[in-house]
Every structure is written in C-alpha cells, then in structure tokens.
C-alpha cells in the first residue's frame, strides 16, 4: 500500500486515557508537518493522511480494501479533492463514522456536493469552527451508537456544522 500517513499516528503526547481518534485528510503539504496541537488541546488523538494525490490506486479504500486509519478513527475531517471519491468510500466502508467535509468552491462559485451521510463544514477556514463541528459530529455518533440507532441516524444531520 502506498498510503501516506503522518508518522505520529493517533498521537497525544503525554496525555492519558482514550480520547476520540480524529483522522485529518488533506493533501496540502503544510499540514503534513503540522503538530495539530489545537485539535489535541480540544481532546482528540490525531492521525494525518495526505490522500492518494494523483494516484487513486494508492488509497486502499478506493481499491475496495480496508484502511487502517479509517478503521481506527472516531471522526474524520476530510479536505481532499472532492472528485477523488474518498469521502464516499469512507462512508461505504464505515457508514457509522462521522465525516466532516471541507467544501471547496467550484469555478463558478458553488460548493461541491457532499456525499450522502457526510456533514458539510460551513466555515472551513476557522480551526475553532472545525473543532466545534468535529466535536458535535463525534458526540452525535457516540450518542446514536449508545442508543442503538442505525448508521442512518448517526449521520442524519446534514446541515452545515
């Protein structure tokens, strides 16, 4: 597998106990060297994946295989190119997993469509807004799982967070 993964998988240095696992997916090079301290301060263990770049075959999900990072995640912040289909593949493999999507604008100014079951992020430029959306999505999924709801219930709030 040619998966590109940050070397500090599920890292929260010096913190005890199980914290929600956040998978950040983004192809921007600057994020590959980020320490993600704001997400860690908000209570998440963080892993990072750069995605398949220009080779969709480099992503195990797009080949119909399991991705170990997605398997271990409690919530995903998805910022990869919408046309790759990674967000939809995540939902096919783990329909109960909340996927919060940054929505880039198309050339004519409208947002790309959000795959079924994913939650659009209204203000992706704000880290505070991202953290708030992730915390709400993870809590909604956790409550739905505790109540015995199906995956549809856990992902039903499709309004922008």
Descriptions of predicted regions:
Residues 100, 119-121:
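Hydrophobic/aromatic beta-strand patches that form the interior of the parallel beta-sheet core
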Residues 78, 100-103:
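Hydrophobic/aromatic residues positioned on beta-strands within the core alpha/beta folds
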Residues 78, 122-123:
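Residues at the ends of beta-strands that form strand-to-helix hinge/output surfaces
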Residues 104-109:
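Negatively charged, flexible loop motifs adjacent to catalytic sites
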Residues 72-81:
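Active-site residues of response regulator receiver
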Residues 82-96:
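Short amphipathic alpha-helix used as the core "switch/output" element in two-component signaling
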Residues 1-47, 51, 55-70, 91-92, ...:
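Non-catalytic signal-transmission and effector/linker regions of two-component phosphorelay proteins
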Residues 46, 97-99:
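Hydrophobic anchor at the start of a short beta-strand
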């Amino acid at each position: 597998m040619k998966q590109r993964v940050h070397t500090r998988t599920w890292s929260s240095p010096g913190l005890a106990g199980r914290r929600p696992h956040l998978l950040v997916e983004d192809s921007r090079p600057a994020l590959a060297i980020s320490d993600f301290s704001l997400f860690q301060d908000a209570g998440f263990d963080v892993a990072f994946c750069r995605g398949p770049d220009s080779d969709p075959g480099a992503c195990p999900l797009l080949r119909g295989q399991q991705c170990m990072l997605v398997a271990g995640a409690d919530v995903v912040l998805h910022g990869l190119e919408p046309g790759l289909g990674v967000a939809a593949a995540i939902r096919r493999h783990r329909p109960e997993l909340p996927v919060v999507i940054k929505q880039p604008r198309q050339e004519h100014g409208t947002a790309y469509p959000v795959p079924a079951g994913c939650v659009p992020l209204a203000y992706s430029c704000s880290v505070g807004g991202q953290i708030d959306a992730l915390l709400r999505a993870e809590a909604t999924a956790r409550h739905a799982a505790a109540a015995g709801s199906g995956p549809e219930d856990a992902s039903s709030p499709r309004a922008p967070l």
